[in-house]
Protein backbone atom coordinates (compact mmCIF):
# COMPACT_ATOMS: atom_id res chain seq x y z
CA UNK A 1 0.00 0.00 0.00
CA UNK A 2 1.45 3.37 -1.00
CA UNK A 3 1.60 6.54 1.07
CA UNK A 4 -1.35 8.19 -0.67
CA UNK A 5 -3.60 5.23 0.08
CA UNK A 6 -2.65 5.40 3.77
CA UNK A 7 -3.41 9.14 3.81
CA UNK A 8 -6.81 8.51 2.25
CA UNK A 9 -7.50 5.80 4.81
CA UNK A 10 -6.76 8.15 7.73
CA UNK A 11 -8.82 10.92 6.13
CA UNK A 12 -11.80 8.64 5.60
CA UNK A 13 -11.64 7.44 9.21
CA UNK A 14 -11.80 11.04 10.45
CA UNK A 15 -15.32 11.44 9.03
CA UNK A 16 -16.72 9.49 11.98
CA UNK A 17 -15.86 12.46 14.22
CA UNK A 18 -17.82 14.97 12.11
CA UNK A 19 -21.08 15.94 13.82
CA UNK A 20 -24.26 16.88 11.90
CA UNK A 21 -24.94 20.63 11.55
CA UNK A 22 -21.42 21.48 12.71
CA UNK A 23 -18.75 23.79 11.33
CA UNK A 24 -15.57 21.78 10.79
CA UNK A 25 -12.09 23.22 11.14
CA UNK A 26 -9.66 22.00 8.50
CA UNK A 27 -5.92 22.54 8.18
CA UNK A 28 -3.86 22.25 5.03
CA UNK A 29 -1.60 19.86 3.19
CA UNK A 30 -1.86 16.67 1.17
CA UNK A 31 -3.55 14.56 3.86
CA UNK A 32 -6.07 17.32 4.58
CA UNK A 33 -6.79 17.50 0.86
CA UNK A 34 -7.85 13.85 1.09
CA UNK A 35 -10.08 14.72 4.06
CA UNK A 36 -11.72 17.63 2.22
CA UNK A 37 -12.49 15.35 -0.73
CA UNK A 38 -14.04 12.81 1.64
CA UNK A 39 -15.93 15.56 3.49
CA UNK A 40 -17.60 16.52 0.22
CA UNK A 41 -19.87 13.49 0.61
CA UNK A 42 -21.20 15.06 3.84
CA UNK A 43 -21.67 18.59 2.48
CA UNK A 44 -25.44 18.48 3.06
CA UNK A 45 -25.02 17.29 6.66
CA UNK A 46 -22.74 20.09 7.92
CA UNK A 47 -23.03 23.87 8.06
CA UNK A 48 -19.60 24.42 6.56
CA UNK A 49 -15.93 24.73 7.43
CA UNK A 50 -13.21 27.11 8.56
CA UNK A 51 -9.97 26.65 6.61
CA UNK A 52 -6.40 27.33 7.69
CA UNK A 53 -5.15 28.21 4.20
CA UNK A 54 -6.35 29.78 0.98
CA UNK A 55 -5.63 26.51 -0.83
CA UNK A 56 -7.91 24.59 1.54
CA UNK A 57 -10.62 27.25 1.11
CA UNK A 58 -10.55 26.70 -2.64
CA UNK A 59 -10.81 22.92 -2.27
CA UNK A 60 -13.74 23.24 0.15
CA UNK A 61 -15.62 25.48 -2.26
CA UNK A 62 -14.98 23.01 -5.09
CA UNK A 63 -16.66 20.38 -2.92
CA UNK A 64 -19.67 22.66 -2.43
CA UNK A 65 -18.88 23.28 1.25
CA UNK A 66 -19.54 26.76 2.62
CA UNK A 67 -16.40 28.45 3.99
CA UNK A 68 -16.55 30.59 7.12
CA UNK A 69 -13.91 32.96 8.48
CA UNK A 70 -12.31 32.21 11.84
CA UNK A 71 -13.80 35.55 12.90
CA UNK A 72 -17.30 34.18 12.23
CA UNK A 73 -17.15 31.44 14.88
CA UNK A 74 -16.46 31.33 18.61
CA UNK A 75 -15.60 27.62 18.69
CA UNK A 76 -15.34 24.56 16.47
CA UNK A 77 -16.53 21.04 17.22
CA UNK A 78 -13.41 19.52 15.66
CA UNK A 79 -10.27 20.57 13.84
CA UNK A 80 -8.72 18.10 11.39
CA UNK A 81 -5.15 18.56 10.21
CA UNK A 82 -2.09 16.60 9.19
CA UNK A 83 1.47 16.76 10.50
CA UNK A 84 5.00 16.55 9.19
CA UNK A 85 6.05 14.68 12.33
CA UNK A 86 4.17 13.48 15.41
CA UNK A 87 5.58 12.01 18.63
CA UNK A 88 4.01 9.55 21.12
CA UNK A 89 2.71 12.50 23.20
CA UNK A 90 0.69 13.68 20.15
CA UNK A 91 2.92 16.76 19.78
CA UNK A 92 3.70 17.72 16.21
CA UNK A 93 5.89 19.58 13.78
CA UNK A 94 3.77 21.29 11.14
CA UNK A 95 4.30 23.96 8.53
CA UNK A 96 5.66 22.11 5.53
CA UNK A 97 2.98 23.88 3.53
CA UNK A 98 3.79 27.26 5.15
CA UNK A 99 0.32 27.59 6.74
CA UNK A 100 1.46 27.11 10.36
CA UNK A 101 0.23 30.42 11.78
CA UNK A 102 -3.29 30.07 10.43
CA UNK A 103 -3.30 26.41 11.47
CA UNK A 104 -2.53 27.42 15.05
CA UNK A 105 -5.29 30.04 14.95
CA UNK A 106 -7.96 27.62 13.72
CA UNK A 107 -6.73 24.82 16.00
CA UNK A 108 -7.13 27.14 19.00
CA UNK A 109 -10.88 27.30 18.33
CA UNK A 110 -11.47 23.66 19.27
CA UNK A 111 -10.91 21.25 22.14
CA UNK A 112 -10.87 18.31 19.74
CA UNK A 113 -7.80 18.42 17.47
CA UNK A 114 -7.76 15.35 15.23
CA UNK A 115 -4.43 14.72 13.53
CA UNK A 116 -4.48 12.50 10.43
CA UNK A 117 -1.18 11.07 9.19
CA UNK A 118 0.34 8.10 7.45
CA UNK A 119 2.69 5.92 9.49
CA UNK A 120 5.85 7.54 8.06
CA UNK A 121 5.16 10.68 10.14
CA UNK A 122 5.52 8.96 13.52
CA UNK A 123 8.79 9.74 15.35
CA UNK A 124 10.12 9.43 18.89
CA UNK A 125 11.79 12.87 18.89
CA UNK A 126 10.46 15.86 16.96
CA UNK A 127 12.99 17.26 14.50
CA UNK A 128 14.39 13.79 13.77
CA UNK A 129 13.48 13.71 10.09
CA UNK A 130 11.80 17.00 9.22
CA UNK A 131 13.15 20.55 9.57
CA UNK A 132 11.26 22.90 11.88
CA UNK A 133 9.49 25.70 9.98
CA UNK A 134 9.53 29.15 11.57
CA UNK A 135 7.39 31.96 10.14
CA UNK A 136 9.27 35.25 10.27
CA UNK A 137 8.52 38.89 9.42
CA UNK A 138 10.76 39.56 6.37
CA UNK A 139 12.84 42.37 7.91
CA UNK A 140 13.79 40.08 10.82
CA UNK A 141 14.92 37.10 8.71
CA UNK A 142 18.69 37.44 9.27
CA UNK A 143 18.33 38.37 12.93
CA UNK A 144 16.09 35.38 13.64
CA UNK A 145 18.40 33.08 11.68
CA UNK A 146 21.32 34.10 13.92
CA UNK A 147 19.25 33.32 17.00
CA UNK A 148 18.35 29.89 15.60
CA UNK A 149 22.04 29.15 14.98
CA UNK A 150 22.78 30.16 18.59
CA UNK A 151 20.16 27.63 19.71
CA UNK A 152 21.99 24.89 17.79
CA UNK A 153 19.98 24.75 14.57
CA UNK A 154 20.87 25.21 10.90
CA UNK A 155 18.24 27.58 9.47
CA UNK A 156 17.61 27.75 5.74
CA UNK A 157 15.49 30.44 4.09
CA UNK A 158 12.71 28.81 2.04
CA UNK A 159 13.26 31.08 -0.95
CA UNK A 160 10.36 31.85 -3.23
CA UNK A 161 7.79 31.05 -0.54
CA UNK A 162 5.61 33.78 0.94
CA UNK A 163 2.98 32.78 3.51
CA UNK A 164 -0.69 33.76 3.26
CA UNK A 165 0.24 36.43 5.83
CA UNK A 166 3.02 37.92 3.66
CA UNK A 167 5.90 36.51 5.70
CA UNK A 168 8.87 34.21 5.02
CA UNK A 169 9.78 30.75 6.30
CA UNK A 170 13.05 29.61 7.86
CA UNK A 171 13.43 25.81 7.94
CA UNK A 172 15.62 24.76 10.86
CA UNK A 173 17.63 21.60 10.14
CA UNK A 174 19.67 19.47 12.59
CA UNK A 175 17.42 20.56 15.43
CA UNK A 176 16.15 17.67 17.60
CA UNK A 177 13.54 19.01 20.02
CA UNK A 178 13.82 17.34 23.41
CA UNK A 179 11.32 19.58 25.22
CA UNK A 180 8.74 20.68 22.64
CA UNK A 181 6.53 22.88 24.91
CA UNK A 182 9.50 24.88 26.20
CA UNK A 183 11.08 25.25 22.75
CA UNK A 184 7.75 26.34 21.26
CA UNK A 185 7.50 29.12 23.85
CA UNK A 186 11.17 30.12 23.55
CA UNK A 187 11.05 30.49 19.78
CA UNK A 188 7.79 32.43 19.87
CA UNK A 189 9.45 34.94 22.21
CA UNK A 190 12.12 35.79 19.62
CA UNK A 191 11.47 39.25 18.14
CA UNK A 192 10.36 38.90 14.53
CA UNK A 193 9.02 35.35 14.87
CA UNK A 194 5.31 35.15 14.06
CA UNK A 195 5.09 31.54 15.18
CA UNK A 196 6.96 28.26 14.83
CA UNK A 197 5.89 24.83 13.66
CA UNK A 198 5.97 23.10 17.04
CA UNK A 199 2.43 22.16 18.07
CA UNK A 200 3.03 21.08 21.67
CA UNK A 201 1.14 23.60 23.79
CA UNK A 202 -1.92 22.68 21.74
CA UNK A 203 -1.19 19.04 20.91
CA UNK A 204 -3.58 16.69 19.14
CA UNK A 205 -6.34 15.03 21.14
CA UNK A 206 -6.82 12.14 18.71
CA UNK A 207 -4.41 10.75 16.12
CA UNK A 208 -5.55 8.67 13.16
CA UNK A 209 -2.70 6.81 11.50
CA UNK A 210 -3.06 5.25 8.08
CA UNK A 211 -1.10 1.99 8.05
CA UNK A 212 -0.85 -0.95 5.64
CA UNK A 213 -3.12 -2.81 8.08
CA UNK A 214 -5.77 -0.08 8.17
CA UNK A 215 -6.56 3.13 10.04
CA UNK A 216 -5.37 3.12 13.65
CA UNK A 217 -7.05 5.54 16.09
CA UNK A 218 -4.98 6.73 19.07
CA UNK A 219 -6.77 8.68 21.81
From Swiss-Prot:
It catalyses: aldehydo-D-ribose 5-phosphate = D-ribulose 5-phosphate. Its EC number is 5.3.1.6. GO terms for cellular component: cytosol. Pathway: Carbohydrate degradation; pentose phosphate pathway; D-ribose 5-phosphate from D-ribulose 5-phosphate (non-oxidative stage): step 1/1. Gene3D superfamilies: 3.30.70.260, 3.40.50.1360. It comes from the Bacteria. Catalyzes the reversible conversion of ribose-5-phosphate to ribulose 5-phosphate. HAMAP family: Rib_5P_isom_A. Belongs to the ribose 5-phosphate isomerase family. This is Ribose-5-phosphate isomerase A. The lineage of its organism: Bacteria, Pseudomonadati, Pseudomonadota, Gammaproteobacteria, Pasteurellales.
Amino acid sequence: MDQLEMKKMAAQAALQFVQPDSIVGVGSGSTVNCFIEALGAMRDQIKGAVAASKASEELLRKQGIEVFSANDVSSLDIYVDGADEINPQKMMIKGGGAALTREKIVASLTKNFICIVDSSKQVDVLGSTFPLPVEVIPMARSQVARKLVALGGSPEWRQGVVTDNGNVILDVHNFPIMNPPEMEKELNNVAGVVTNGIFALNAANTVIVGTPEGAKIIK
